[in-house]
């Protein structure tokens, strides 16, 4: 506990606000039991066993935790690290004014979706696990075709993580209704911006109404992907 506390206190205290995930997912009793077991397994592994020695850091002191859990969940740990940098500057014990918590700035609604008690969200392993589960759930819900480019796929998933999958899905439906590619980030980004205007958010295909956060969401996607590119150059998957 002392080692964990010292590591936590040594990080920079800087916070970026996490704008929540708008979609609501339900969890069956079977899934809930599975999630409880997975969380318990994570919590039984000492944090010290997942933290590398200081001279072994590639990206952050949480390389071990982020890498181990991301690999288990089938995600690129360098992408998850880029998200963590943007969200918290790798600060594990912070809570934003909006209630987002920890390394990945997890909102209370996300913890509830995955049956995680709020008092456990600040635990780094649980926090990173929740972020991985959320990204996997988003990717599955978007149902992007196999031929979608990796860049478009990552951009759409990140936009959903930041601005809400409901608004991204609206933008994709608008693109489709106007005869454009709903799987192109360039196209979807444009319709996210247009969803601030009545002639678009009042369209019958729109389910989540007006969206005024497109500027923040587009900047988020660009920032995270730019940092991800840098991390890919210094660390292997």
Predicted region positions:
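Export/targeting segments at the very N-terminus of extracytoplasmic proteins
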Residues: 37-92, 125-128, 142-148, 236-237
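Non-catalytic cell-wall polysaccharide-engagement segments
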Residues: 2-34, 73, 112, 116-126, ...
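Short, surface-exposed glycine/acidic/tryptophan-bearing loops
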Residues: 94-113, 177, 185
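Amphipathic alpha-helical recognition patches that constitute DNA-binding helices
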Residues: 79, 102, 153-156
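Soluble periplasmic/extracytoplasmic beta-strand elements of cell-envelope proteins
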Residues: 82, 105, 157-160
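Residues at secondary-structure transition points
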Residues: 57, 98-101, 122, 215
């Amino acid at each position: 506990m002392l080692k964990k506390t010292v590591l936590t206190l040594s990080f920079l205290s800087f916070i970026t606000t996490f704008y929540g995930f708008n979609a609501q997912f339900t969890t069956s009793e079977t899934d809930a039991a599975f999630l409880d077991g997975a969380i318990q397994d994570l919590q039984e592994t000492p944090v010290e066993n997942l933290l590398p020695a200081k001279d072994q850091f590639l990206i952050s002191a949480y390389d071990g935790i982020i890498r181990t859990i991301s690999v288990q969940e089938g995600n690129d740990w360098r992408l998850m690290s880029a998200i963590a940098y943007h969200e918290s500057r790798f600060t594990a014990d912070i809570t934003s004014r909006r209630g987002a918590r920890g390394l990945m700035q997890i909102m209370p609604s996300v913890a509830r979706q995955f049956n995680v008690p709020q008092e456990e969200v600040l635990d780094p392993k649980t926090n990173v696990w929740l972020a991985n589960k959320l990204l996997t759930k988003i990717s599955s819900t978007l149902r992007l075709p196999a031929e979608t480019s990796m860049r478009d796929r990552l951009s759409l998933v990140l936009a959903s993580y930041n601005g809400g999958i409901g608004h991204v899905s609206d933008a994709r439906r608008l693109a489709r209704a106007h005869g454009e590619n709903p799987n192109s980030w360039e196209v979807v980004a444009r319709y996210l911006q247009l969803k601030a205007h009545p002639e678009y958010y009042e369209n019958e295909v729109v389910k989540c109404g007006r969206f005024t956060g497109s500027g923040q969401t587009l900047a988020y996607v660009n920032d995270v992907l730019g940092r991800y590119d840098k991390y890919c150059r210094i660390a292997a998957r």
